[in-house]
């Protein structure tokens, strides 16, 4: 699933469907860093979760991202492929087609430092959302994205909806 704008999918339903049809769950949690479903963090429900640190995300390193998994074999494979698939760290021997998806150390350090500040970033996102709700509730037919009672959303981007379109 893709968790959109800080909100999370109904993971119980999705996991039930995955079991029924023998599917693997891989979460795109790019917009849901810091969001929870029934007390469990986004990205932790399937075989793997992915997060982006692009410039417009709640935490940014200017680019790059993170893969999370509890599967040790998959974690090693991901690390191997994202570090150019070198079979020897000192020689230029590649046993598969790999890519250079490593964050440079400075960018990684920025991400780690911001991770410690994530609760404060999310608190501020909630304050902004509360402001918009206070100021825009009752204006025309504006309504806000609904968040399931089971979700603690990070409010990544305030989202409003309306039936009317201005041409």
Identify the meaning behind each predicted range.
Residues 1-2, 7-13, 20, 36, ...:
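PLP-dependent aminotransferase class I/II
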Residues 1-61, 66-68, 73:
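Active-site phosphate-binding strand-loop segment of PLP-dependent enzymes
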């Amino acid at each position: 699933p893709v968790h959109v704008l800080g909100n999370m999918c109904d993971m119980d339903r999705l996991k039930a469907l995955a079991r029924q049809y023998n599917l693997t769950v891989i979460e795109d949690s790019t917009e849901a860093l810091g969001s929870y479903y029934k007390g469990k963090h986004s990205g932790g429900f399937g075989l793997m979760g992915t997060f982006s640190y692009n410039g417009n995300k709640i935490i940014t390193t200017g680019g790059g991202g993170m893969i999370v998994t509890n599967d040790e074999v998959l974690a090693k494979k991901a690390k191997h492929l994202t570090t150019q698939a070198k079979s020897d760290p000192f020689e230029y021997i590649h046993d598969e087609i790999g890519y250079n998806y490593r964050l440079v150390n400075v960018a990684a350090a920025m991400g780690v430092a911001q991770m410690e500040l994530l609760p404060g970033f999310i608190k501020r996102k909630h304050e902004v959302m509360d402001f918009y709700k206070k100021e825009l509730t009752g204006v025309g037919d504006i309504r806000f994205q609904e968040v399931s009672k089971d979700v603690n959303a990070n409010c990544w981007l305030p989202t409003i909806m309306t039936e009317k379109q201005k041409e």
